[in-house]
Amino acid sequence: MTTLAIDIGGTKLAAALIDKNLRISQRRELPTPASKTPDALREALKALVEPLRAEARQVAIASTGIIQEGMLLALNPHNLGGLLHFPLVQTLETIAGLPTLAVNDAQAAAWAEYHALPDDIRDMVFITVSTGVGGGVVCDGKLLTGKGGLAGHLGHTLADPHGPVCGCGRVGCVEAIASGRGMAAAARDDLAGCDAKTLFIRAGEGHQQARHLVSQSAQVIARMIADVKATTDCQCVVIGGSVGLAEGYLEQVRAFLMQEPAPYHVALSAARYRHDAGLLGAALLAQGDTL
């Protein structure tokens, strides 16, 4: 059965046809509408889906935000603008005329990465470090989404009670410090205004402040992983995202994790599917892998 998988992100919309063997074909991408209005997103999704829908039998969506009863929500409502409470599933069912499933993008990515692991791994956690910090948890072979879709939002656990205010309203969230956005917000002097990509370049050149910001991010993620190990007793943690997959970052996280007491150590690995993980995970779920 061919699935039309859609990935809805903050900057781009992606779609592809995925068969039962997880082969991807006919990929399409469009920019996410800057206006963040329901009409703009609806029209963009229609343009994205229309050339592909005739060859699909179902639709699977991996989206930023929280998916609750088919509607789009967020811990930080400002991130969605006018899209708060957008009827995502209903909209795609109308556009495509096909049964539709929707799940958070990090949860979907976790499910894809879980399927890439050896069969004896039943408990794993996926962490994406990018513009924000997100995650997904698989426990005893089942993806945890939670009653309200909140499960796995690890970036909104506490890192520093005296840290910066997070967009979700809490003080000192992991995301507010360790994410690409958090790193950029903390940059000062000649690094002020630099994005995370530039900070990594400058760190590679030996810039002390840039090196500190990258190191601080890695340490915060390592401490969060120790907390996750204590909470889930997971067998492994898979790291993805543009920051998480940046050169040398995973090695720094691993080094900081090794400084924690031994019971909190856990195997770390880089994401296999990278930017396709959300599409593949959503397709897997739609093709019959239950939550």
UniProtKB/Swiss-Prot annotation:
<feature type="binding site">
    <location>
        <position position="166"/>
    </location>
    <ligand>
        <name>Zn(2+)</name>
    </ligand>
</feature>
<comment type="pathway">
    <text>Amino-sugar metabolism; N-acetylneuraminate degradation; D-fructose 6-phosphate from N-acetylneuraminate: step 2/5.</text>
</comment>
<comment type="subunit">
    <text>Homodimer.</text>
</comment>
<keyword id="KW-0547">Nucleotide-binding</keyword>
<keyword id="KW-0418">Kinase</keyword>
<keyword id="KW-0479">Metal-binding</keyword>
<feature type="binding site">
    <location>
        <begin position="5"/>
        <end position="12"/>
    </location>
    <ligand>
        <name>ATP</name>
    </ligand>
</feature>
<feature type="binding site">
    <location>
        <begin position="132"/>
        <end position="139"/>
    </location>
    <ligand>
        <name>ATP</name>
    </ligand>
</feature>
<dbReference type="InterPro" id="IPR049874">
    <property type="entry name" value="ROK_cs"/>
</dbReference>
<comment type="function">
    <text>Catalyzes the phosphorylation of N-acetylmannosamine (ManNAc) to ManNAc-6-P.</text>
</comment>
<comment type="similarity">
    <text>Belongs to the ROK (NagC/XylR) family. NanK subfamily.</text>
</comment>
<dbReference type="GO" id="GO:0005524">
    <property type="term" value="F:ATP binding"/>
</dbReference>
<keyword id="KW-0067">ATP-binding</keyword>
<keyword id="KW-0808">Transferase</keyword>
<keyword id="KW-0862">Zinc</keyword>
<dbReference type="InterPro" id="IPR000600">
    <property type="entry name" value="ROK"/>
</dbReference>
<dbReference type="GO" id="GO:0009384">
    <property type="term" value="F:N-acylmannosamine kinase activity"/>
</dbReference>
<keyword id="KW-0119">Carbohydrate metabolism</keyword>
<protein>
    <recommendedName>
        <fullName>N-acetylmannosamine kinase</fullName>
        <ecNumber>2.7.1.60</ecNumber>
    </recommendedName>
</protein>
<feature type="binding site">
    <location>
        <position position="168"/>
    </location>
    <ligand>
        <name>Zn(2+)</name>
    </ligand>
</feature>
<dbReference type="GO" id="GO:0008270">
    <property type="term" value="F:zinc ion binding"/>
</dbReference>
<feature type="binding site">
    <location>
        <position position="156"/>
    </location>
    <ligand>
        <name>Zn(2+)</name>
    </ligand>
</feature>
<dbReference type="InterPro" id="IPR023945">
    <property type="entry name" value="ManNAc_kinase_bac"/>
</dbReference>
<feature type="binding site">
    <location>
        <position position="173"/>
    </location>
    <ligand>
        <name>Zn(2+)</name>
    </ligand>
</feature>
<dbReference type="GO" id="GO:0019262">
    <property type="term" value="P:N-acetylneuraminate catabolic process"/>
</dbReference>
<dbReference type="Pfam" id="PF00480">
    <property type="entry name" value="ROK"/>
</dbReference>
<dbReference type="InterPro" id="IPR043129">
    <property type="entry name" value="ATPase_NBD"/>
</dbReference>
